[in-house]
UniProtKB/Swiss-Prot annotation:
One Gene Ontology term of the molecular function aspect: ubiquitin protein ligase activity
Alphabetical list of InterPro entries matching this protein: E3_ubiquit_lig_Bre1, Znf_RING, Znf_RING/FYVE/PHD, Znf_RING_CS
Protein name per UniProt: E3 ubiquitin-protein ligase bre1
Example GO biological process: chromatin organization
Keyword Protein biosynthesis tagged: no
Keywords, in A-Z order: Chromatin regulator, Coiled coil, Metal-binding, Nucleus, Transferase, Ubl conjugation pathway, Zinc, Zinc-finger
Gene name, Swiss-Prot/TrEMBL: bre1
Residue intervals of every RING-type zinc finger in the record: 673-712
Coiled-coil intervals: 175-228, 269-526, 559-656
Pathway field: Protein modification; protein ubiquitination
Length: 725
């Protein structure tokens, strides 16, 4: 009994109803079309029909249990009524909203069609138009076709007119348009179905939440209610307690034959004890199975935690067994080999670098010597330039002194020229005086010629005296003329000499001025060249320092470039060799990859097959394990029933030895079907729990009188099961 009461907690509502209906006895249950129990209890003549279980010891418990079951069923009906009322309110609200929505859409659609008709103008009936085939009508979908059938004519007419106004398109475009419209229509239908499914899912989720809440409340109430009646019933079934006076009644009932195929109280107690033992054995087995499953679950949880720990923090062994670790290990070995090779090459390169450093130092020393030689040469050139500069300065000083001397001589010559000029002026004055004297003498001579005309009148002695005077004057004049001639010659010579000297001096002055200008030009040119040489010397010194730095840098860069060139050549040769080896490895790897791809494809197919096989095996294993558990529980129950049947067999053997024919007939009548009275009971109806033979149940199923012969409760094709008494 505890198991039978606890089972509705985890079952559905229909299962609860079935279990509650099973608890009602066959004689007390009534048909759905029959009147209520109170009216059924009264007869026509006012007498009362005795209850078939009136003399049973569990009458009061049965009545209380029936009332409790009826009350629970009424509460269940009440809860269903409340849930259905809430659903009805929600559906009515949604229906009103959707009706308003559809009316608005219908009005909008009519307005749209009317506006399109007014825009398109009057309907031209005579004009032939191509038939319009669109996916907007949703002809292949029942819901859209059902809702849009009333609008299909308007839709077809208006869209046909729109199509007639459109530009003629090629058939490929029309086909693509029709396919696109069809796909869009399918998409809209799928979206509508999806929205409908989502709405249904939301409603079902809400109902599931409400049902789960009701289930939790009912479970609490059931746990609260189990503590009274169930404990009492368990106590009664375990202890076999009976009401006072029950022994005599039971003795009388044992002598009587069972009414309507119902067993006696002792047999019912034994059956209940057997059922209790079966349930206890089943519960024991289920406990063992649960303990086993819990242990397996604990092992699996521990394995899962271990695997999670290993997954979060794998050990070195786990890393060592992975393919990635093996691949990395092989790569690491290759890298170690390469590192060793590179270390050897590094040692060799270090030796070469030391050698190159020594060569570089030697070359640097050589370059330093060369630069020192060049610097010495440049310094010698600089000294020569300085000596030339000193010599030029000395020449300049000499030229300046000569210039000063020439200036002094020129001044002296200027004084001589002034004196010569004065002499020339004096000579000119003398010449002027002599000219005036000559003029005077000429006048005297003219006078004398005039006197010669009167010479005849002059005496001879006067003439002789005059002649003598004249001869003396003439001689004096001759002497004076000769002296004057000599003086004039001297004057002319001196004058010509002075003129020549002056002309020579002038030429010399002109030449000296030219030489002075040349000397000045040379001096300024020498000064300019000196400054230029000084600048050149400075620039040469700066360039020399820079060139020495540049030369050292160039030598260093040349050494580095040579070393880099050697290294690059070595690296190029190494890379060529490595490239060749890598190319060969690449070809081998490509071939191996191709082979591995083939193997991987095969392995993937095998893995997929094994996955499918593992899934099927898992499902079959789960079903087999569940079937095994069910079989184990059935085996335990069958073992208990076997033990009870063995005990009853021993009892019956003992009774058969005592020739107790009345008990045998009673048990035979209990085992026989209450309908045909010829076959044993082997089929139970699930809806009410009454037991009949298989032939009677199948006969009622084939004749469509699918109601229990005892309680008239209806049952279906799958509402019966085979039992073993």
């Amino acid at each position: 009994m505890p198991a039978t009461e606890a089972s509705p907690v985890v079952c559905s509502e229909s299962a609860i109803v079935k279990m509650e209906d099973r608890k009602r006895p066959a004689t007390h249950d009534h048909n759905d079309s029959a009147p209520p129990l109170k009216k059924q209890a009264t007869s026509v003549n006012g007498g009362s029909k005795p209850h078939p279980d009136a003399d049973m010891p569990w009458k009061d418990d049965l009545e209380r249990f029936q009332k409790d079951a009826i009350w629970r069923q009424m509460q269940e009906y009440k809860r269903e009524k409340m849930s259905l009322e809430t659903k009805l309110k929600e559906m009515s609200k949604a229906t009103a909203y959707h009706n308003d929505h559809l009316r608005v859409i219908d009005a909008w659609f009519n307005q749209l069609i009317d506006e399109v008709k007014t825009l398109m103008g009057a309907l031209d009936e005579d004009k032939d138009r191509p038939s319009f085939r669109s996916s907007l009508l949703f002809e292949n979908m029942e819901d859209f076709e059902k809702h849009l059938k009333a609008r299909s004519d308007d839709i077809r007419a208006i869209i046909t007119r729109l199509q007639s106004f459109s530009i003629n398109a090629p058939p490929e475009v029309t086909d693509l348009q029709s396919q696109l419209a069809k796909k869009l229509a399918e998409e809209k239908g799928t979206i509508a179905e999806l929205e409908k499914a989502l709405a249904e899912k939301q409603q079902l989720e809400e109902s599931l939440e409400a049902a789960s809440l009701r289930y939790m409340v009912a479970e609490k109430k059931l746990d609260r209610a189990r503590s009274l009646t169930v404990a009492k019933l368990e106590k009664q079934y375990l202890l076999g307690a009976q009401r006072p006076g029950g022994d005599s009644a039971s003795g009388n009932r044992e002598e009587q034959s069972p009414v309507n195929g119902l067993p006696s109280s002792a047999e019912r107690n034994t059956e209940l004890e057997e059922a209790h033992k079966q349930l206890v054995a089943v519960s024991e087995k289920q406990k063992e199975q649960l303990q086993k499953l819990e242990s397996e679950n604990a092992n699996l949880l521990s394995q899962i935690t271990e695997l999670n720990i290993k997954r979060t923090k794998p050990t070195d062994d786990d890393y060592a067994h992975t393919d990635l670790f093996k691949q990395l290990r092989s790569q690491y070995d290759d890298v170690v080999k390469r590192i060793n090779h590179l270390e050897a090459t590094n040692i060799q390169l270090r030796e070469e670098a030391a050698k190159l450093r020594s060569e570089r130092t030697a070359y640097r020393n050589q370059v330093d010597e060369e630069t020192q030689n060049v610097i010495a040469e440049k310094e010698a050139q600089l000294m020569r330039a300085e000596t030339d500069l000193a010599r030029i300065r000395n020449a300049r000083d000499e030229l300046l002194a000569d210039q000063q001397m020439r200036k002094a001589a020129q001044e002296q010559e200027k004084i001589a020229t002034t004196k010569v000029q004065e002499l020339a002026d004096a000579a000119q004055a003398r010449i002027n005086a002599l000219e005036s004297e000559v003029d005077r003498l000429r006048l005297q001579l003219d006078n004398t010629k005039a006197a010669h005309t009167e010479i005849d009148d002059v005496p001879l002695e006067e003439l002789r005296a005059k002649y003598q005077n004249l001869e003396r004057q003439y001689s004096m004049l001759n002497t004076e003329l000769t002296s004057m001639q000599t003086a004039c010659k001297k004057y002319s010579l001196l004058a010509s000499q002075k003129v020549a000297d002056f002309s020579a001096l002038e030429e010399k002055v002109a030449r000296l001025t030219a030489e002075k200008s040349k000397a000045d030009q040379k001096y300024f040119a020498a000064m300019k060249s000196k400054e230029a040489r000084e600048l050149e010397v400075r620039t040469l010194r700066i360039q020399n320092s820079k060139s020495s730095d540049i030369v050292s840098q160039l030598k260093e860069s040349e050494a580095t470039t040579r070393s880099l060139l050697a290294n690059m050549e070595k690296q190029a040769s190494e890379t060529k060799e490595a490239l060749n080896s890598i190319i060969s490895k690449h070809h081998a790897a490509q071939q191996q990859i191709a082979e591995n791809n083939i193997v991987i494809d095969g392995l993937k197919a095998q893995v997929n097959e094994l996955k499918a096989l593992s899934v099927s095996k898992d499902s079959s294993l789960a079903s087999a394990s569940s079937a095994c558990r069910k079989a184990e529980t059935e085996i335990e129950s069958l073992k208990v029933t076997l033990a009870d049947t063995k005990k009853s067999l021993e009892n019956w053997k003992n009774k058969s030895l005592g020739n107790s024919s009345s008990e045998y007939e009673m048990l035979r009548s209990l085992a026989l079907c209450t309908v045909c009275r010829r076959n044993f009971k082997n089929t139970a109806i699930k809806t009410c729990g009454h037991v009949f033979c298989k032939e009677c149940v199948e006969e009622r199923l084939t004749s469509r009188s699918r109601k229990c012969p005892n309680c008239n409760r209806s049952f279906g094709n799958n509402d019966h099961m085979h039992i073993t008494l």
